A protein has these predicted regions:
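N-terminal hydrophobic/helix-forming segments and targeting peptides
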Residues: 1-432
Length: 432
């Protein structure tokens, strides 16, 4: 198998092991540990030296990996790649069991982010997330991660015979229509703790010890390749776990030993990044400051280091859809397999400008990768991403990029094998 093929198979495995943000971070931890990175606690005293490789997590759903360079950050700046661990999905609400007529037990859910709702219907779903158990005292609950590997639930459509407008853009109620079926119950069955008992059995703990949970639905169908030559990737959470995988691959294979390298994986980008583990928080800036000071610098050195730094903010872009050409800019519509996209917006929704885009194009040329421009159709509003949020926290130059995907925010998105391999090459070039 070629190394480039290994990158794709590694991505598929990574996606299957990462059904939600918490499991994605746990999978990243395992990859980093296997490549010589040591875990630190965020509240440990920062003691590092040149050549150290370490990581720490925030809220179990964000992770920051660092390779300390031989030279002072004030002289070289930091090289940073940012991505995010979360994807649109359904979260399970507290007190979630809803018994109904016909003896059907459903779970009460809440929409996280902006998923394409219709894509979640009529497919096998299961549970993943974290569970908080009683600990040694009230301030120290114990965290357990959970991933139920078997199909547990299904969100079922109403038959077309009862809804003739279903194929005509019939609107959905998130509260009524998107509740998954979990079990068949009878009158004598105690249903109120069905979910907690299920979770307790999976974790082999007592249900009474469960204090709370963050549980999400996920599609149990595995990531796969398709196309005449297996050139396409079909999977959930390509946005943005494919960029997480590329960033972590790049830092574990990095050749630059002089500059300090950082892979920053934030959470909650899909809901605005306004959490303690999101890009709006000071967590990255605080870590960089502590790094500079641990290496003998001061606040002046920190300011110089950040100003001399460069960041690649990696979040997927919209690929050109041949069925809907009118939705795209007539001259800047990236295609699957055409290479990483540089995101540009006249109203500064992205951190890219001509200078930072030129740097990324040079990295692409050095890596032997094609590149594309992504610009929104002028009559179609686009989304935002990590870049501009982070520039509100750090005085840093950077570029917003991402690989093109179709059906962004669907339960299964479509990407390109070549694009993923090329993005890894470019990120490795940045870290070389």
């Amino acid at each position: 198998m070629k190394k480039t093929d290994k990158y794709v198979s590694s991505l598929l495995e990574f996606l299957d092991n990462s059904p939600c943000n918490f499991l994605a971070v746990d999978t990243v931890k395992k990859i980093l540990t296997a490549n010589g990175f040591k875990e630190k606690k965020i509240d440990d005293k920062m003691t590092v030296k040149a050549g150290d490789k370490f990581f720490f997590t925030k809220n179990d759903s964000a992770i920051f990996a660092v390779q300390v360079g031989k030279k002072k950050p004030a002289d070289t700046g930091f090289k940073i790649i940012a991505a995010h661990s979360d994807s649109p999905c359904f979260r399970i609400k507290p007190a979630s069991e809803i018994p109904g007529d016909g003896g059907i037990l459903r779970l009460n859910t809440e929409v996280y982010g902006g998923p394409i709702l219709y894509t979640w219907f009529d497919r096998p779903l299961s549970l993943a997330g974290r569970v908080l158990l009683k600990g040694k005292d009230a301030l120290h609950p114990v965290t357990k991660l959970i991933k139920v590997d078997r199909p547990l639930m299904c969100i079922s459509h109403l038959a077309i015979h009862f809804n003739r407008a279903v194929n005509e853009g019939n609107p959905l109620s998130k509260q009524k229509d998107m509740l998954p079926i979990l079990a068949k119950i009878n009158r004598d069955m105690e249903w109120r703790n069905t979910l907690l008992n299920l979770v307790a059995d999976e974790l082999q703990v007592e249900a009474d010890d469960i204090l709370d949970f963050d549980l999400m639905l996920y599609d149990v169908n595995k990531a796969n390749l398709f196309g005449l030559n297996n050139e396409f990737i079909s999977a959930g959470r390509l946005d943005d776990l494919s960029m997480v995988h590329a960033a972590i691959t790049a830092i574990t294979e990095a050749k630059d030993k002089n500059a300090t390298l950082v892979a920053a994986i934030f959470d909650n980008e899909e809901t605005g990044s306004g959490t303690k583990q999101g890009a709006h928080s000071p967590v990255l800036g605080n870590m960089l400051l502590r790094l500079v000071m641990a290496l003998g610098g001061d606040f002046e050195d920190y300011g110089r280091a950040v100003h001399r730094s460069f960041m690649i903010s990696a979040d997927n872009a919209h690929a050109f859809h041949p069925n809907y050409p009118e939705k795209y800019d007539p001259t800047n519509h990236p295609s699957l397999g055409g290479g990483p996209c540089i995101k540009v917006n006249a109203n500064c929704k992205y951190m890219s400008d001509a200078h930072s885009a030129a740097i990324f194009k040079s990295l692409c040329e050095g890596a032997g990768s094609p590149f594309q421009n992504f610009v929104n159709h002028s009559d179609v509003a686009g989304g935002s991403t990590l870049g501009n949020i982070l520039t509100g926290q750090l005085d840093i130059e950077g570029v917003d990029v991402g690989n093109p995907v179709l059906a962004m925010h669907s339960v299964r998105e479509t990407g390109s094998c070549d694009d993923h391999v090329n993005m890894i090459k470019v990120m490795k070039q940045f870290f070389s």
